[in-house]
Amino acid sequence: MRKHTLSVIVITKNEEDRIETCLKSVVDIANELIVLDSGSTDATVEICQKYTDNVTITDWPGFGKQKQRALDKATCDWVLSIDADEALDKEMSDALVELLKQDQIKHTAYKLPWGVTLYGTTLKHGRSARAVLRLFKREGSRYTLDEVHETVVPEQGSTGVLKGFLLHYTHRDYGHGLDKAAQYAWLGSQKYHRKGKKSHGLFLALLRAIWTFFLVYIIRRGFMDGSVGFIMAMTYAQVNFNKYVGLWILENRSDDRSNDQAK
């Protein structure tokens, strides 16, 4: 018998090809399943309504604000935040059920090891060799309001790691991967610019890209994931390069405007 209740929160837009896998992996675990959709034009909403009545259509304020909206709707003891292109594997699902049965849960938050599934391969190294904080006590937790790469700030306490994998079906195909990488790079450029971060020039952008490839492919052993591991290391290097190039362009555009105003 479970001693703790669980809210699962998901944000969606045009995810009809992936959302059902996500919802199937959590529907039997969740005490409440909360979906916020930001204007899907495909069958995403209809699919979600097969699994929960708690589906809300909203505008799109950015990732952080949308996740916070979903969190504000949660009422259970614990919250699992899962993306539409993710799903719990069986080991993680079972581990979560066992956790909620405990009288006293040791930690206030848990990281979930990522298993990026790409081009038919589930990667276990490289960028996937990390765990993301997605399970946390609801009381006292909040999201940062960043437009991209938002993070949850849980109630003060220790953080554990849940067994199993959070499967991440990150790219529909290579073209989708390129589009997604470009979007995240540009959003990252704008985020850094708003926060006053400096690019320190294009040569440093190149060095950052080289370091990213070395980190993902060598230090985190992306080479052990074969050809797909190489593709992923190159993709992340390109994203980091584009992010700082975008920041450099924004800096120079701001400088040009300041000079024009001073004339």
Report the location of each language-model feature:
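Short beta-strand/loop segment that forms part of the nucleotide-sugar
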Residues: V10, A30-G39, T56, A84
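Acidic helix N-cap motif at the loop->helix transition within catalytic regions
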Residues: D17-E20, D42-Y51, E91-M92
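A conserved acidic beta->alpha catalytic loop
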Residues: S25, D37-E46, D83
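Short, structured coil segments at secondary-structure junctions
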Residues: I29, K50-T52, A131, E155
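Conserved donor nucleotide-binding strand/loop of the catalytic core
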Residues: N31, V45-K73
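Catalytic-site signature of metal-activated, phosphate-bearing donor transferases
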Residues: K65-L71, W78, I82, D89-R253, ...
